[in-house]
């Protein structure tokens, strides 16, 4: 929690979270070497964080992870000083966003150039988290304005995710991470009708990610969505299989050859053709490559820093055999932890 607190306060700008923070001259990532040429890189030479550097131009992606970590820690620990620190930090960030009309504003007074506008689902989730921690009237009032019937169109537009099936797949991770606390806390604070609307919206929009050999996504659906266990239960079976199949530590980078046994997704072929014939579509929507109709099991997915945010439908060769490049393993840890927390697996499994 000190790390998340530090990411907020190292910037010196109230309510603005750093994209990254580390000691200067770090052996693991000497990113401060670029500070002389990169306007978003900042060295700190005085105060509490003297000797650190941080990167700005922060996006809603980083804010999503920061809020998720703060929200979960707040409800899972019983250390009151730490809980108060979390609540104070969250309130500071949300107040800054409210003051800037839900844009992430950098230290230069301008919105960042990397996803700075906060869309309805994230606004509601972060306000809900802040209200949950503080009970502040201003958070409640703005949250209520996002729960009116006329506000629902904003959620529907923000939740359109068809292209995240084929490009910018990481967007599915951001949406699932947001949905988790929106539904978890919405169950407590929303009216039954509003809560049910959000559950149904989640069910309608997050479809192609289910049973896609993504333990993280399935756990969020199983714990917060309209999941009804069957007998036999494909969700439970695949969840256990995916966690069991996860790569043993150390989780090093590996080369994966092109997959050969799969059914092609015809929509991906069509989109690839259209973008070849009409290049400006690629500029608008991103590059689409032909991919499989069904997700590959974990051992046949490309290596990555956080496996669950990468596309499991990729058919091309990827990665390199590089035992010196070790991934942190947080993807397995969060996948296992959430499954155990919600009793989908037990510690003796």
Where are these regions (language model features)?
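Extended ligand-binding groove/face enriched in aromatic
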Residues: 2-116, 120-121
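Ser/Thr/Asn(+Pro)-rich, low-complexity disordered segments
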Residues: 1-7, 90-124, 130-349
């Amino acid at each position: 929690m000190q790390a998340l607190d530090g990411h907020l306060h190292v910037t010196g700008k109230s309510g603005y979270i750093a994209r990254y923070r580390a000691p200067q001259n770090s052996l693991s990532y000497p990113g401060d070497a670029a500070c002389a040429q990169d306007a978003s890189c900042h060295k700190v030479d005085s105060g509490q964080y003297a000797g650190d550097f941080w990167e700005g131009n922060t996006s809603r992606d980083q804010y999503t992870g920061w809020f998720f970590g703060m929200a979960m820690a707040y409800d899972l620990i019983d250390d009151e000083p730490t809980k108060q620190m979390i609540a104070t930090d969250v309130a500071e960030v949300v107040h800054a966003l409210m003051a800037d009309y839900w844009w992430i504003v950098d230290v230069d007074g301008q919105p960042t150039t990397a996803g700075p506008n906060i869309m309805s689902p994230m606004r509601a989730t972060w306000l809900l988290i802040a209200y949950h921690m503080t009970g502040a009237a201003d958070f409640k009032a703005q949250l209520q304005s996002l729960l009116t019937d006329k506000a629902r169109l904003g959620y529907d537009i923000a939740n359109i995710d068809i292209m995240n099936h084929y490009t910018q797949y990481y967007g599915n991770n951001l949406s699932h991470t947001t949905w988790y606390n929106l539904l978890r806390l919405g169950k407590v604070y929303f009216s039954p009708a509003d809560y049910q609307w959000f559950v149904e919206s989640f069910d309608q929009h997050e479809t192609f990610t289910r049973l896609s050999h993504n333990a993280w996504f399935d756990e969020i659906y199983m714990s917060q969505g309209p999941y009804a266990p069957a007998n036999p239960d494909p969700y439970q079976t695949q969840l256990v299989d995916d966690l069991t199949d996860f790569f043993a530590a150390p989780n090093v980078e590996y080369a994966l050859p092109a997959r050969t046994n799969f059914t092609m997704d015809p929509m991906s072929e069509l989109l690839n053709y259209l973008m070849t014939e009409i290049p400006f579509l690629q500029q608008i929507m991103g590059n689409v490559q032909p991919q499989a109709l069904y997700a590959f099991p974990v051992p046949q997915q490309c290596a990555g820093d956080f496996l669950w945010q990468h596309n499991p439908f990729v058919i091309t060769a990827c990665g390199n055999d590089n035992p010196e490049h070790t991934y942190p393993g947080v993807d397995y840890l969060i996948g296992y932890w959430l499954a155990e927390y919600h009793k989908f697996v037990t510690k003796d499994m």
